[in-house]
């Protein structure tokens, strides 16, 4: 999940970099009434705040629309006289370094908050798993009783499907809990 969000963050970086190549810095985005750069930076700040929430999807939809709009207009413009693509790239990199580092740090802080919550939750998840495992004998005894009843009702095939499904679910849960244990045993993020 976090890797997907980081991919989205890369898309938002493109949004800001594209804003820097607008020939007319005073031109406003109709939807926001602000300049391209101001709009792009707002989207990035919002992303940093929403990195651990459902709000990210809506932000990314808006960001993609802005990127498309920026690119359409940029394609229709020529570079100013005396400006090479190399020089433009250098200017963009310098501007990005000054403007984006604080925003990236905010996004990083959001991801660290999510990781910290996972560290705090892991012991509880493992405790729940232990409880489930302690009841496994009861669970299989219940299934055995169902099997006995199913034989009388000639429902062997149906019960086999239920039992196979439960076995698959148990194996999946064990795999998930192994991942949780690894997360719990890893050092927490630096404060």
Swiss-Prot record:
Signal peptide: 1-23
Cellular location(s): Secreted
Keywords noted in UniProt: HDL, Lipid transport, Secreted, Signal, Transport
Distribution of this protein across tissues and organs: Plasma.
Cellular component terms per the entry's GO annotation: high-density lipoprotein particle
GO biological process: lipid transport
Name under which the protein is recorded: Blood plasma apolipoprotein LAL2
């Amino acid at each position: 999940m976090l890797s997907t969000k980081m991919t989205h963050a890369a898309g938002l970086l493109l949004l800001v970099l594209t804003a820097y190549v607008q020939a007319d810095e005073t031109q406003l985005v109709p939807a926001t009434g602000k300049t391209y750069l101001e709009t792009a930076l707002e989207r990035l700040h919002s992303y940093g705040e929403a990195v651990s929430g459902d709000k990210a999807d809506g932000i990314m939809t808006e960001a993609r629309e802005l990127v498309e709009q920026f690119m359409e207009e940029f394609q229709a413009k020529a570079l100013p006289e005396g400006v090479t693509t190399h020089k433009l790239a250098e200017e963009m990199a310098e501007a990005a370094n000054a403007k984006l580092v604080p925003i990236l740090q905010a996004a990083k802080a959001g991801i660290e908050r999510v990781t910290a919550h996972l560290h705090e939750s892991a012991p509880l998840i493992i405790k729940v798993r232990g409880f489930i495992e302690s009841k496994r004998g009861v669970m299989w005894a219940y299934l055995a009783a169902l099997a006995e009843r199913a034989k009388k009702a000639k429902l062997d095939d149906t019960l086999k499907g239920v039992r196979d499904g439960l076995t698959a679910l148990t194996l999946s849960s064990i795999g998930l809990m192994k991942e949780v244990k690894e997360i719990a045993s890893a050092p927490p993020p630096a404060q």
